[in-house]
């Protein structure tokens, strides 16, 4: 676990202790990836918009069947409000995400269909992805990307540091939740039934409506410029 995730776990311990000792009301909520306008991580859906609009190749890890989830920011804000109004949620843990899940290929296809382009798919062989994930394949472009990682001096620790940095860098190519924890082809799906049961909350968006609403915002605001050097080097490795 990196420092960011470790600190969240420590915070949970503090809140649980405050509830047990002082009756301090708290609820722990685990988010999957947030999707929507003004996302503070622009390398997810916003980068995919820009990639497809520019006609760039879309790199697909493995066979593209890995499954993940995103949740729209408006749905998740409504969920947080519902939690704050439901006393039964105190002292409990919940997941918040969208009502559906999709494969990497489905994510790209839905986004491309809305934009009105045919994606140029480039598949990265599983063996290449394994080498990238394990830090055995060095990709120079973007290697200065910063991540808050505990660094030791042993060769194994340096290799692990390299692999974790590459994993987070690759998450700008295809969204991955906690790439420091999950393997590149590990499907990650959250259950939201407990939250729905305890709060009567229900997500309103599916992926298609998330794309439509967020891409409209993207067009209205003019998008942003992206550096494609990392992806270009991956494409060069693939030949």
Features from the language model and the residues they span:
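A short C-terminal helix-loop "cap" of Rossmann-like NAD(P)-dependent dehydrogenase/epimerase domains
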Residues: 49-61, 114-122
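Glycine/small-residue-rich pyrophosphate-binding loop that anchors the diphosphate of NDP-sugar donors
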Residues: 67, 184-187
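Amphipathic terminal alpha-helices
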Residues: 206-239
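Mid/C-terminal beta-alpha module of Rossmann-like enzyme folds, strongest
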Residues: 82-180, 192-194, 198, 212, ...
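Short-chain dehydrogenase/reductase
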Residues: 1-13, 42-46, 69-70, 101, ...
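Residue-level signal for the nucleotide or nucleotide-sugar donor/cofactor binding architecture
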Residues: 71, 102, 190, 205
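Substrate-positioning beta->alpha
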Residues: 42-48, 61-84, 91-92, 106
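Conserved beta-loop-beta element that borders a ligand/cofactor-binding pocket
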Residues: 11-38
């Amino acid at each position: 676990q990196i420092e960011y995730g470790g600190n969240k776990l420590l915070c949970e311990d503090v809140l649980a202790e405050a509830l047990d000792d002082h009756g301090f009301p708290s609820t722990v909520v685990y988010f999957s990836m947030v999707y929507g306008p003004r996302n503070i991580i622009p390398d997810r859906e916003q980068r995919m918009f820009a990639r497809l609009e520019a006609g760039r190749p879309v790199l697909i890890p493995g066979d593209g069947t890995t499954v993940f989830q995103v949740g729209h920011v408006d749905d998740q804000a409504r969920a947080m409000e519902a939690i704050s109004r439901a006393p039964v949620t105190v002292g409990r843990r919940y997941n918040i995400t969208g009502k559906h899940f999709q494969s990497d290929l489905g994510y790209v296809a839905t986004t491309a269909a809305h934009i009105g382009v045919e994606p140029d798919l480039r598949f990265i062989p599983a063996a290449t992805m394994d080498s990238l994930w394990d830090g055995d394949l060095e990709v120079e472009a973007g290697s200065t990307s910063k991540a808050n990682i505990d660094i030791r001096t042993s060769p194994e620790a340096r290799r692990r540091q390299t692999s974790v940095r590459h994993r987070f860098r690759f998450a700008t190519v295809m969204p991955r939740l906690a790439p420091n924890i999950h393997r590149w082809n590990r499907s990650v799906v959250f259950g939201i039934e407990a939250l729905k049961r305890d709060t009567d909350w229900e997500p309103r968006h599916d992926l298609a409506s998330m794309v439509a609403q967020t891409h409209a915002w993207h067009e209205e605001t003019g998008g942003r410029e992206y550096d494609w050097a990392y992806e270009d080097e991956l494409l060069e490795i693939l030949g």
